UniProtKB/Swiss-Prot annotation:
GO terms assigned for molecular function: pyridoxal phosphate binding
Species the sequence originates in: Pasteurella multocida (strain Pm70)
Gene3D superfamilies, per database record: Alanine racemase
InterPro entries xref list: Ala_racemase_N (IPR001608), PLP-binding_barrel (IPR029066), PyrdxlP_homeostasis (IPR011078)
UniProt-recorded name of the protein: Pyridoxal phosphate homeostasis protein
UniProt KW Protein biosynthesis keyword: no
Amino acid sequence: MTIEQNLAQIQQNIQHAVQQAKRPESAVKLLAVSKTKPVEDIYQAYQAGQTAFGENYVQEGVEKIQYFAQKNIPLEWHFIGPLQSNKTKLVAEHFDWMQTLDRKKIADRLNEQRPHYKKPLNVLIQINISDEDSKSGIQPNEMLDLAKQIQNLPHLCLRGLMAIPAPTDDLATQEQAFTQMHSLFEQLKQALPDAQIDTLSMGMTDDMASAIQCGSTMVRIGTAIFGARDYSK
């Protein structure tokens, strides 16, 4: 199957899940995870109508952003990997979204380093919803403190929450994590009524339907669009 065919199939799957959940047709946005994929693949996806892409590695992402900017192709770029403080400047300068914010130190650096001529950097707070030692993200009870600190930073725009639950085939376990995330998302909206809290980024290729059922507004799909990743490059 081509990238275009894969995208069409995924959009169909998203619409089916949205209908099953009795949610509006435009409720869920697709983020194409393009890490380790060449610009030719991204261009194919763009030609098929996909405009939002997620990258996990700073340097690789910046090179792709610059490539498409030079061609005047207007794509939306999301950073979705763990971010070390020595790499914040590149994310602040080049990306449109940063989905994995989990420390005030990183928020402060992104705010200071975001060019003033650009719109504020859209950010999501990453929650470690499955309480895994190996995962980035903050504990749920730390969410509101960090959110209020971000609200005071003029060059960041807090848009919501992101999570990567522990992988499992058990639907009940999937839904438990996603339901908890949706509850936190609603808490955040109530705590900050004047903020633009509209994005709950959760759900990947294998658990997308559960995530949409539980209120996800953005699913992050890579392999099902682009095929298996080649990490040797």
